[in-house]
């Protein structure tokens, strides 16, 4: 189910505070966050946010097409290594 339109989009308060502080300074620096569930809002456009994927923080530059999506969508948590090699010797 999608979130009700009566409610506002979820953004972690600590992340929102950091973005508003950088917007008043007009400085660009990487914001580190573990909040993958936060929704991208228009005030985040132009910032680089390092999103935690379970092992490291992946920097993501926010553009206008990302508004409305969650931060976790842009930092993959699983690295697909490929399917197992088809080994015919082990079957015999």
Swiss-Prot record:
Pfam families: Ribosomal_S19. It comes from the Eukaryota. This is Small ribosomal subunit protein uS19c. Protein S19 forms a complex with S13 that binds strongly to the 16S ribosomal RNA. It comes from Draba nemorosa (Woodland whitlowgrass). HAMAP family: Ribosomal_uS19. Keywords: Chloroplast, Plastid, Ribonucleoprotein, Ribosomal protein, RNA-binding, rRNA-binding. GO terms for biological process: ribosomal small subunit assembly; translation. The lineage of its organism: Eukaryota, Viridiplantae, Streptophyta, Embryophyta, Tracheophyta.
